[in-house]
Design a protein with these regions (language model features):
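Juxtacatalytic substrate-recognition/specificity segment
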Residues: 26-159, 165
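Short hydrophobic alpha-helical segments that form membrane-spanning helices or hydrophobic packing faces
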Residues: 54, 243-247
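Cleavable N-terminal signal peptides
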Residues: 13-14, 24, 180
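Acidic/His/Gly-enriched intrinsically disordered linker/tail segments
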Residues: 30-35, 121-126, 134, 139-232, ...
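Bacterial N-terminal signal peptides that target proteins for export
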Residues: 1-12
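N-terminal signal peptide c-region/cleavage motif recognized by signal peptidases
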Residues: 19-23
Length: 295
């Protein structure tokens, strides 16, 4: 048997690849990190499948009750009741967050409260906020989006949801948590401090693009704060059905390149940038008058 000896070129290539591997970093996932020994239980209701670690049943039942109570309320302004969904609760983590995944369709909640927690219970606040995202995404399942769902499954909703701005998703969810809990972020003066401070300054207001994308030089609000102001202004000026109509437009016309902005213009006469200008003008007067005499 003849064994070919490695050439200098092959040895050099191998050493180069081994050297480069030293700079590789593994990916860290916030889900799927639960101990393998963890046993799971579930609670089944008409609208939810709540999956939770063994021993967490009291908090899981509490969360289930909150979700069932919010089911008819959180979707009222969008005129939508979503299909049944799985809710997975993680308690073996230090992360304080939650998210909704369109595919496979589910909610994941991390039960450890943040250090700067609100006065309302963390799981109550988190469950309502994330369930509003469920309503938003499930609302898109209509028209052409539903047809695409037969071809691409749940990925179709994820694709169409990507056409909608993050400020809408998060701002609208903050409205829901503020309306359905005792102390949602929209009720806190500190939540709007970045925009209030900017409006109180004598310099011109930042452009919509800068407020949307952020800045390394200037302090700008995140999409939660910006979105809360824009979505609440839209509801106040054009009715609670504005965002329902916009979502209907996006779900039925996902082929339009700027479907969200076109839908917003169709039902309010404003595009996203002009909505921002109008909202900041209104809030400037609202904050400077001490909230008096505004309607």
């Amino acid at each position: 048997m003849i064994i070919n000896q490695p050439t200098k070129r092959q040895i050099f290539l191998l050493l180069f690849l081994l050297t480069e591997m030293g700079g590789a970093h593994a990916q860290f996932f916030t889900t799927g990190q639960d101990p393998a020994s963890l046993r799971w239980q579930q609670i089944q209701t008409d609208h939810f499948q709540v999956i939770f670690p063994e021993g967490f049943e009291p908090k899981a039942q509490y969360t289930t009750n909150i979700l069932e109570h919010a089911y008819g309320l959180a979707g009222r302004s969008l005129d939508h009741k979503p299909r049944k969904i799985s809710v997975i609760i993680h308690n073996q983590t230090v992360i304080s967050n939650g998210f909704v995944a369109p595919a496979p369709h589910r909610v994941e909640l991390f039960s450890v409260p943040p250090q700067d927690n609100l006065d309302s219970p963390w799981l109550e606040h988190l469950a309502i906020h994330e369930f509003r995202h469920v309503v938003q995404i499930d609302k898109l399942d209509q028209g052409l989006t539903r047809v695409l769902g037969y071809l691409f499954g749940e990925q179709a909703n994820a694709l169409v949801a990507g056409m909608m701005p993050m400020w809408y998703f998060e701002g609208d969810a903050v409205i829901a948590e503020s309306a359905l809990t005792r102390n949602g972020r929209g009720r806190l003066p500190s939540f709007s401090r970045n925009i209030r401070a900017r409006l109180a300054d004598s310099v011109p207001l930042f452009s919509f693009d800068k407020m949307l994308m952020g800045s390394y030089r200037d302090n700008t609000p995140n999409h939660y704060e910006l979105g809360y102001h824009l979505t609440s202004y839209g509801r106040k000026q054009y009715g609670a059905g504005l965002w329902q109509n916009v979502q209907n437009h996006v779900g039925q016309r996902p082929w339009q390149l700027f479907s969200f902005s076109l839908g917003l213009n169709r039902f309010s006469g404003l595009y996203s940038g002009s909505l921002y200008d109008s909202a900041m003008t209104w809030f400037d007067e609202y904050y400077h008058t001490g909230n008096k005499g505004m309607s």
